[in-house]
Amino acid sequence: MATYTCITCRVAFRDAEMQRAHYKTDWHRYNLRRKVANMAPVTAEGFQERVRAQRAVAEEESKGTATYCTVCSKKFATFNAYENHLKSRRHVELEKKAVQAVSRQVEMMNEKNLEKGLGVDSVNKDAMNAAIQQAIKAQPSTSPKKAPFMPTDESRRVAGAVRRGTPERDPTEKPPRLQWFEQQAKKLAKQQWEESEEEGEEDDEDWEDIDSDDGLECENPGVEEEDAEDAEAEESPPLGAIPITDCLFCSHHSSSLVKNVAHMTKVHSFFIPDIEYLSDLKGLIKYLGEKVGVGKICLWCNEKGKSFYSTEAVQAHMNDKSHCKLFTDGDAALEFADFYDFRSSYPDYKEGQDPAEIEDLSSEKILECDDETMELILPSDLEYFD
């Protein structure tokens, strides 16, 4: 009959099932550690004696901590003496000082969190007090009988809330960056639809008479009021947008837009690319204020990198990473095309020329044909030879 053994514990089993069960016991794991340390294995009886001795020590330590004052670093023989000590004036004064010391540490943590963009207004006061009490109990002491502080799940959650300075965020909530990009996509689709509607109305003007126009105006008296309300809604800045007189990268406020741009250039090394062709400075800074304040988006990272959930956090990121600049490489420059006018860089541009005149050039001017030679003549008066 086959014999099943454990070389580490030096025991034998009558079947494989008992052997597999033995491999899962604490006794076998204990002997494995002793084997790694080049020590002889212990028997099952010896292991049980060690376990009982360890439990007795743990119980003794737990009794010691039950009558030990962590604030005053004193041990008491009985619970009555311990209870009387908790009511003494000296203990109350020391506990108050300990609370003040821990409170200062919490305030310092909150100041650091503010620098990182995490607020403290939403912290529950009860949660903060509970975390302070837990921190007082966890303070190190000189007593050899004091057992180490083991925080519970509740204390970890409370202390984490105090350190972060913000409540736990819903994991299903969309990041502000994604919400902002979706809003921009909707605005672009609406703008394209309105432009197509305007083009269709212009094409239909030749087929409509004055009477029909008057009839439409009478049938829809509230259209103009609705358009006015939509215009007012578009003019009002969205919630959280940074004003054009506030810095995009810190809390500095300027008295004018020009001074604000000068501050960002001097303090944060911010510069506007191709500024000689910039036609709408106010619109550009307003757009960037919405991008940073509403979308919580880094001007350099854009859709790449980590998501931010507060304006202070994305501002701290841009300052720390030197991202106080616009990303305009490749197709990314098209994002700011509405704020620029590059017509002055065209070789055939004439100062004061209406851009509509350039777009409305007739096809006869673009392509002409010589009646005698049947050659195409380009707008620059150059002949085309096949």
Curated annotation (Swiss-Prot):
Region (Disordered): 135-237
Keywords assigned by UniProt, alphabetized: Acetylation, Cytoplasm, Metal-binding, Nucleus, Phosphoprotein, Repeat, Ribosome biogenesis, Ubl conjugation, Zinc, Zinc-finger
Positions of modified residues (N-acetylalanine): A2
Primary site of residence: cytoplasm
Zn finger region (U1-type): 4-28, 67-91
Post-translational modification (record): Phosphorylated by MELK. The phosphorylation may redirect the protein to the nucleus. Ubiquitinated by HECTD1, leading to its degradation.
Segments traversing the membrane: none
GO BP annotations listed: intrinsic apoptotic signaling pathway in response to oxidative stress; positive regulation of apoptotic process; positive regulation of JNK cascade; positive regulation of MAPK cascade; ribosomal large subunit biogenesis
Family, per entry: Belongs to the REI1 family.
Quaternary structure, from the entry: Homo- and heterodimer. Associates with pre-60S ribosomal particles. Interacts with MELK and MYBL2. Interacts with DNAJC21.
Role, per record: Pre-60S-associated cytoplasmic factor involved in the cytoplasmic maturation of the 60S subunit.
Protein name listed in UniProt: Cytoplasmic 60S subunit biogenesis factor ZNF622
Organism (species): Rattus norvegicus (Rat)
Gene designation per UniProt: Znf622
